[in-house]
Amino acid sequence: MICSICKKGETSVVDSRPTEDGTAIRRRRLCVCGARFTTFERVQFREIMVVKKNGRKSSFDRDKLSKSIYIALKKRPIDTETAEKFISRTSRALEELGQSEISSNTIGTMVMEGLKDLDPVAYVRFASVYRNFREEKDFVQFVDKLDVYKKR
């Protein structure tokens, strides 16, 4: 594994254990430069192609999904373990659909539904990008539809 600090490939594994949900192996690594970092090893069940709105296709990228979810969760009271479980559940649910091609709309909807239960603010943040909110009224209309806010 190449160190992200010094870019050398001289690292050793100092700790290895399965993640709590059992879907990956978490490894703590130590580089000769002294840097420590974590890597994850996951099983890829099948190759999934994402069909974009314009019809273009690209391979499903778990890291891209993860980044978009972490952006929505930024500065929210959700710990990394909870976020990783959510990302793993979402990835697994996509694989369990059993389809070789999945629309970006299906993925976005699945993430939104999960975030709705996990953190309402992250849900609105994700929706604002996914649904391409342009003006303040777009946010207001969306939030007005949320049951979470209507109950208050």
From Swiss-Prot:
Keywords: ATP-binding, DNA-binding, Metal-binding, Nucleotide-binding, Repressor, Transcription, Transcription regulation, Zinc, Zinc-finger
Domain of life: Bacteria
GO molecular function: ATP binding; DNA binding; zinc ion binding
GO biological process: negative regulation of DNA-templated transcription
UniProt domain ATP-cone: residue ranges: 48-138
InterPro entries: ATP-cone_dom, NrdR-like_N, RNR_NrdR-like
Cofactor annotation: Zn(2+)
UniProt cofactor note: Binds 1 zinc ion.
PANTHER family membership: TRANSCRIPTIONAL REPRESSOR NRDR
HAMAP family recorded: NrdR
Family named by the database record: Belongs to the NrdR family.
Matching NCBIfam families: transcriptional regulator NrdR
Protein name as catalogued: Transcriptional repressor NrdR
